């Protein structure tokens, strides 16, 4: 099974507001960069989308080390998701899980691979995490410009 390192990040201008996600995928000495964004979103949604998009970009099952600076993603995937699934994607107090459709998509994407999750401190000089952050900001930029243009009208 191929081994892939993935570094993800999300960014948002306002929360909610225009947002973007970025991911760096590395297999040996081959590197792929991805980014995207949405006009009206949250930072947490962008963090989730970065991980989902990166895992879905892998064409075959892989051994994956996925690095994120999001405690929300780390806690959700390692602590909370088991209870949510058991409760039909409801929280302990029977409310629908926030961003439930994205958590379900991440769960499905993860199930195709053998993923080990790693938390990295954001904005601490980790080169791949910094690059994922740059890609997230790049993914957000077109939506940020449109948001500013709408504000001037």
From Swiss-Prot:
It is an enzyme of class 3 (hydrolase). It catalyses: Endonucleolytic cleavage to 5'-phosphomonoester. CDD domains: RNase_HI_prokaryote_like. GO terms for biological process: DNA replication, removal of RNA primer. Keywords: Cytoplasm, Endonuclease, Hydrolase, Magnesium, Metal-binding, Nuclease. It is found in: Cytoplasm. Residues 1-141 form the RNase H type-1 domain. Mg(2+) 2 binds at residues 9, 133. Signal peptide: none annotated. Its EC number is 3.1.26.4. Belongs to the RNase H family. NCBIfam families: PRK00203.1. This is Ribonuclease H. It comes from Sinorhizobium medicae (strain WSM419).
């Amino acid at each position: 099974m191929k081994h892939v390192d993935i570094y993800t990040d999300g960014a948002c201008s306002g929360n909610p507001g225009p947002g973007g996600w970025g991911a760096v995928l590395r297999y040996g000495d081959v590197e792929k960069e991805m980014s995207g964004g949405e006009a009206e979103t949250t930072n947490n949604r962008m963090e989730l989308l970065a991980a989902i998009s990166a895992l879905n970009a892998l064409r075959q099952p892989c051994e994956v080390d996925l690095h994120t600076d999001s405690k929300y993603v780390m806690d959700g995937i390692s602590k909370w998701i088991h209870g949510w699934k058991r409760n039909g994607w409801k929280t302990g107090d029977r409310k629908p899980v926030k961003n439930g459709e994205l958590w379900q998509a991440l769960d499905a994407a993860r199930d195709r691979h053998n993923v080990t999750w790693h938390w990295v401190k954001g904005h601490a000089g980790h080169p791949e995490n910094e690059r994922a952050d740059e890609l997230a900001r790049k993914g957000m930029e077109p939506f940020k410009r449109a948001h500013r243009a709408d504000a001037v009208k």
